[in-house]
C-alpha cells in the first residue's frame, strides 16, 4: 500500500537509511550533507536523491530545514517513508517535495543506489 502525502513526480537515485532523520540537527541545510555520525548515511548528501528513511524525529523546526534545503537547492527530489510524521510532511508540503508513505514490505524492497521514479498521478506510484 502506498499513500501520497505530497503530490509530484521525481526520478533519481535512492539514498536509503534505516535510521530516522532529525532534519534540524543532522542535515546541513546549505549542502544537504548528513552530519549525524550515528546515521548510516553519515557524510552523504541528500541533494538530488530519492531519500528513503523510516520517519523523521526531532523538533518541528525541522520542517523549515527541509524548506531551507529546497531554497539552497540541496533538497532531495522526493522522500519515501514508512511513517508520515508532521515535521517531514509539513516540510515537504512547504518545499513542494513529493512524499509518499509505503508499507514495511515496500520499504524493505527498495535498494540503496537504485534508480526509481515516483509519479503520484499514476496508478503505479513507485517504479
Model feature map: region roles:
Residues 4-6, 10, 16-124:
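Feature captures the catalytic cores and cofactor-binding loops of soluble hydro-lyases/lyases
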Amino acid at each position: 500500500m502506498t499513500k501520497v502525502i505530497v503530490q509530484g513526480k521525481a526520478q533519481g537515485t535512492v539514498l536509503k537509511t534505516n535510521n530516522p532523520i532529525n532534519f534540524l540537527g543532522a542535515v546541513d541545510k546549505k549542502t544537504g550533507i548528513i552530519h549525524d555520525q550515528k546515521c548510516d548515511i553519515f557524510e552523504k548528501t541528500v541533494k538530488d536523491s530519492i531519500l528513503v528513511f523510516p520517519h523523521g524525529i526531532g523538533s518541528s523546526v525541522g520542517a523549515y530545514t527541509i524548506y531551507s534545503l529546497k531554497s539552497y537547492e540541496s533538497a532531495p527530489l522526493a522522500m519515501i517513508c514508512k511513517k508520515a510524521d508532521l515535521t517531514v510532511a509539513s516540510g515537504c508540503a512547504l518545499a513542494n517535495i513529493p512524499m509518499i508513505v509505503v508499507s514495511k514490505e515496500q520499504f524493505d524492497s527498495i535498494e540503496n543506489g537504485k534508480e526509481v521514479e515516483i509519479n503520484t498521478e499514476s496508478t503505479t506510484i513507485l517504479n
